[in-house]
C-alpha cells in the first residue's frame, strides 16, 4: 500500500531481511530503527519518544505497522444459515470480523490476529455479547506448582463476577447489575504470541 504512512516501515524490514540472507554481509539495523522512531513519533505513539519500553510494546507497534502498510479493501462474504445458538454466535463473530477488517485486510491479520468473545450474564440470561480481535495474549501465571500453559489459559478465561463498584452497566435502562462475565477464544491466530504477567497489582 504505497499511500500508507507506514509503508517505509515495511520497506526497511524487507531490506533488513534481504541483507540477512546475503552471504558475507554485515547487518546493521540502524536504518530500520530510525524509520521506526520516525513513524512512531509521527503517529504520537509513546514508543517513539526514546523512553524505556519493553519488547511487547514494540512488537505490537511493529505488527500493526506492517498491517497498515500492506492492507487493502477486500470483499468478505458470510454464507450459511443459522440453525442453533452456536451458529448465531458464529454469525455474530464473523460479522464483527468483517466490520473490523473489510476496509483494511492483510496477510498480517491472517497470521497474527485471533478473536475473543465475551458474554455478560445477568441471572442466567445473556445480556451482552462482544467480539474483539486480539493479537497479543498476556496470560496470568497460575499460583501453583508445576503449572502448564493450559493452566494459564484457563486462568485467563476464568469467569469473573462483576459486583460492588465493578457492576455491569446496562446502557439500555441506565442501571447497574451484578453479573457474570465469561470469555472464550473463538478464533486463534496461526502465529500465537504470548507474554506472561509476572507481577500482580
Predicted regions and their residues:
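UBL (ubiquitin/ubiquitin-like) substrate-recognition surfaces
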Residues: 1-201
